[in-house]
Amino acid sequence: MTASSWELLALYLGALLLAAWPLGIWLARISSGRLPGWMQRVEAPLLRLAGTSADQAMNWWQYALALLAFNALGLLAVYALQRLQAVLPLNPAGMAAISPDSAFNTAISFVSNTNWQGYGGEASMSYLTQMLALAVQNFLSAATGIAVVFALFRGFAARATGAIGNFWVDVTRITAWLLLPLSLVFALFLAGNGVIQNFDAYKDVATLEATSYQQPKTGLDGQPLKDAQGAAVMENVRTDKQTLAMGPVASQEAIKMLGTNGGGFFNANSAHPYENPNALTNFFQMLAIFLIPAALCFAFGREVGDLRQGWAVLAAMTVMFVIAVVAITPAEQAGNPLLTPLGVDQAASALQAGGNMEGKETRFGINASSLFAVITTAASCGAVIAMHDSFTPLGGMVPMVMMQLGEVVFGGTGTGLYGMLIFAILAVFISGLMIGRTPEYLGKKIESHEMKLTSIAILVTPILVLAGTAVAVLAGAGRAGVANPGAHGFSEILYALSSAGNNNGSAFAGLSANTPFYNTLLGLAMWLGRFGVIVPVLAIAGSLAAKKRLPVTPGTMPTHGPLFVLLLIGTVLLVGLLNYVPALALGPVVEHLMLWPAH
């Protein structure tokens, strides 16, 4: 890594720490209900409208049923808006209705906080669909994840009550007093720095010269046509005009990052200058992705009565994050050995970023693109400023591994921390076995019931990813979507399932995934990957809440020091990553060995 790479990383972590600490204090107050009186008076009518109140607690299965019903209704609403958008207002570009399979996939994608996009936003979605369906779910899916980790906080902090809070109260407070205020401020900042915010019709402008190109031919339903072999039917196009898409971008961009959603208003996502114009907006977008996940660590420490617990979890996350950045940046700075015999200068200098610049924006370069790639995949965000499919084999493997760890390195809003706490429970259990003592974490005994639920929560996503990859590789419809042969084609499929199953949403975009096969397969992976983990986590929270809190004794294993941090990191790497080693060996590892030794 160059000196500038280290400087950017240090600046980022310093700014993150400064911003996350005060937000963590506020998150703890929201979780515990210690809000100013005027806020409670504002939210009271909303809660009455929902038929509940702030003092009406739920047990874990009531909380889970409310959460599942809420998200199921969101799924139906997003699906309906897509299917009806052709006859609804705020559609100046005349977008057609989305096909049933694509609408199904997109609805699950945004409800599950994955934001996988098999479509191009500016070519498919009306302004109404973007705002009322997708942007709304950006708020609600993020609030759902934070609500679940709040419930887990209460499970650790409760003293034999069995109650873990009220889902409706949590979602209302998180949305009203956290996500909306932060998004408003961030949207104003983005709009002031060049991110567009309007309802104008698309604008046609003349280009400097005529351009000829090929594009997939589409049918009446707006979907690409396929030939008998399943390949896209191409058509030749010549034009001297360019269409500039417009829209209310800044308002959606803010919650896209703060909620670790990641779904772009435009197909190029945050590489598009209308979403991310310059280095300043890019830095703050990176900061926004990790802001709430980092702040939740501090809130966790406050809620369980020991700030050191939050620092320990944050330290484990940060160490793994830094290792990933240190791995990906040199891989991208090394460049492509196939270009060296052609006399291409790939050395970094004052005049060029050097390295592997394929698929990257010159306004960001290698350092920011590599850092962003790790942030967005560590945090289950999935927004991109560079095409991960164009990274070097090892450079592309790092984002894949970040997802396959279970999105626990900071992770999504709420999801990252509850995922890491599940690994903490496992780490405590393993340490208890080694010393012959009943394991306990934060004063709660970890027994067979909790370990069964922990095993389910950890194994759900690897099963979905590996089984889904096997199905896609074996099925003709799955192989038809692969643009590249050999190891990289396998990596494209593995990346897609890793992204969907772990609710990230980024892609190796060479995979043609907007087909009935992939829309269905990835949709199921996203839904089960989201709620197949949430339900066991809530069950663990309920089980812990019903237990008494034990006093600390000389035999209690400390869970706030460097030893526990190392144990936690080791547990995440050994349990979370070993599942995928054979698959990674068939994809990026083989591709790397084919690329470098021969050159």
Swiss-Prot record:
It is found in: Cell inner membrane. It is a multi-pass membrane protein. Its main location: membrane. The keyword Calcium does not apply. GO terms for cellular component: plasma membrane. Keywords: Cell inner membrane, Cell membrane, Ion transport, Membrane, Potassium, Potassium transport, Transmembrane, Transmembrane helix, Transport. GO terms for molecular function: P-type potassium transmembrane transporter activity; potassium ion binding. The chain crosses the membrane at residues 8-28, 61-81, 133-153, 176-196, 280-300, 311-331, 366-386, 391-411, 416-436, 456-476, 521-541, 563-583. The system is composed of three essential subunits: KdpA, KdpB and KdpC. Belongs to the KdpA family. Part of the high-affinity ATP-driven potassium transport (or Kdp) system, which catalyzes the hydrolysis of ATP coupled with the electrogenic transport of potassium into the cytoplasm. This subunit binds the periplasmic potassium ions and delivers the ions to the membrane domain of KdpB through an intramembrane tunnel. This is Potassium-transporting ATPase potassium-binding subunit.
